[in-house]
């Protein structure tokens, strides 16, 4: 079964955060191929929107002023392989940072639901960790 997440744009940092719906923060940060990324500042994230850290492998958006925005998506089952995706999402996030018109948050939600979770849960795609880095 696919994880339930909501996409939220944090205007203070201009990053897209994916949060587990109705979940408490019990997860652990996931280390990707670029090393561990710091979690976003909790002061910019309202408490009632759930965790910003990975919860049993749910998506994470990590940001640091010293690093590019990295959106890491993992399936709940395993995280053995990595791919740098050459898809539309990095371009969309880059446009947001430049103040250009880009995909709406609703469209991004549909992108994750239709593309990523469908690949993992319905098609059984074996790549379990996707990393985009701007």
UniProtKB/Swiss-Prot annotation:
Localization per record: Host cytoplasm; Host nucleus; Host mitochondrion
UniProt PTM: A fraction may be phosphorylated in insect cells and HepG2 cells, a human hepatoblastoma cell line. Phosphorylated in vitro by host protein kinase C or mitogen-activated protein kinase. N-acetylated in insect cells.
Keywords: Activation of host NF-kappa-B by virus, Activator, Apoptosis, Host cytoplasm, Host G2/M cell cycle arrest by virus, Host mitochondrion, Host nucleus, Host-virus interaction, Modulation of host cell cycle by virus, Transcription, Transcription regulation
UniProt biased composition (Low complexity): 29-47
Keyword field contains Cell cycle: no
Superkingdom, taxonomy of origin: Viruses
Region (Mitochondrial targeting sequence): 68-117
GO BP terms, alphabetized: DNA-templated transcription; symbiont-mediated activation of host NF-kappaB cascade; symbiont-mediated arrest of host cell cycle during G2/M transition; viral genome replication
A GO CC term attached to the entry: host cell mitochondrion
Start and end residues of each stretch annotated as Disordered: 25-48
Annotated InterPro entries: Transactivation_prot_X (IPR000236)
Role according to the record: Multifunctional protein that plays a role in silencing host antiviral defenses and promoting viral transcription. Does not seem to be essential for HBV infection. May be directly involved in development of cirrhosis and liver cancer (hepatocellular carcinoma). Most of cytosolic activities involve modulation of cytosolic calcium. The effect on apoptosis is controversial depending on the cell types in which the studies have been conducted. May induce apoptosis by localizing in mitochondria and causing loss of mitochondrial membrane potential.
Similarity annotation: Belongs to the orthohepadnavirus protein X family.
Subunit annotation: May form homodimer. May interact with host CEBPA, CFLAR, CREB1, DDB1, E4F1, HBXIP, HSPD1/HSP60, NFKBIA, POLR2E and SMAD4. Interacts with host SMC5-SMC6 complex and induces its degradation. Interacts with host TRPC4AP; leading to prevent ubiquitination of TRPC4AP. Interacts with host PLSCR1; this interaction promotes ubiquitination and degradation of HBx and impairs HBx-mediated cell proliferation.
Name of the protein: Protein X
